[in-house]
Design a protein with these regions (language model features):
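Bacterial Sec-dependent N-terminal signal peptides
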Residues: 1-22
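Low-complexity "stalk/linker" and mucin-like segments enriched in Ser/Thr/Pro/Ala/Gly
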Residues: 33, 56-68, 157-178
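Short, solvent-exposed loop/linker segments at the N-terminal edge
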Residues: 29-36, 118-127
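Proline-enriched interdomain boundary motifs that mark the N-terminal boundary
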Residues: 20-25, 107-110
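Short, aromatic- and glycine-rich surface loops/edge beta-strands on solvent-exposed regions
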Residues: 53-54, 77-98, 184-197
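Short beta-strand elements
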Residues: 93-108, 199-214
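Acidic, Ser/Thr
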Residues: 41-47, 132-141, 154
Length: 214
């Protein structure tokens, strides 16, 4: 009887100790890849911060201060990530948490301050030096870069020329086409390939940028 009482008491105390764990993502309750800094707070009663080990199923977690960590993920191989928290003193698993991993928003292509299908004055159009990508409504400091794009230049007489450009800034061939802009000409930027943060995957925008020179 005493033995059963001891086991029951130990189980209750052990479960109570395990319950003294607070883990929270500071911004939103999901993780984002591409190197976004997913900041998190971890507090475990009776376990010094220096004895905590945080093991992510993928990505990397860095301690930035007492109880505060940053979880960074590059590629998104799955939409679920698991965090295991251990006590370094006895290698005991204190808690296991599961989080959803969301894709970052699709960036929006811009030419200067203009979006797709806006008419562009000739002089203003020629002063632009390249395309840019903007992440809207995304509360993380993350940059997306253009890998390459194709430009189709269609004159008012319907003559057409296509050039490929590596990177965001105009190369010499594309710059030459930009300099030819006249009223009624059309410039279509398409097959825009991009990469965000540390995510190695090259993706393509579904939207094109099409401008008519006025």
């Amino acid at each position: 009887m005493k033995s059963m009482y001891f086991v029951l008491l130990f189980t209750i105390v052990h479960l109570a100790a395990r319950a003294q764990v607070a883990v929270s993502l500071d911004k939103v309750n999901v993780l984002y890849p591409a190197g976004a800094e997913n900041t998190m707070t971890v507090v475990v009663t009776d376990v010094p911060d220096s004895n905590l080990v945080l093991e992510p199923s993928f990505g990397e977690i860095k301690r930035v201060s007492q109880g505060h960590y940053v979880w960074q993920i590059c590629g998104r191989d799955t939409n679920v990530a698991t965090l295991i928290i251990k006590d370094l003193r006895n290698n005991e698993v204190i808690a296991t948490k599961t989080y959803r991993v969301n894709m970052i928003p699709i960036p929006e292509p811009m030419l200067g301050s203009k979006k797709r299908h806006d008419p562009r004055p000739n002089g203003e159009f020629k002063t632009q030096g390249g395309l840019a990508l903007v992440l809207n409504k995304f509360d993380f400091d993350l940059k997306c870069d253009i890998v390459y794009f194709d430009l189709q230049y269609i004159t008012k007489n319907m003559d057409s020329v296509v050039k490929r450009n590596s990177g965001a800034r105009w190369n010499s061939e594309v710059q030459e086409l930009i300099n030819k802009a006249k009223t009624g000409d059309i410039y279509a930027f398409y097959h825009i390939a991009y990469r965000c943060g540390c995510d190695p995957m090259v993706r393509f925008l579904s939207d094109d940028l099409i401008f008519t020179i006025k």
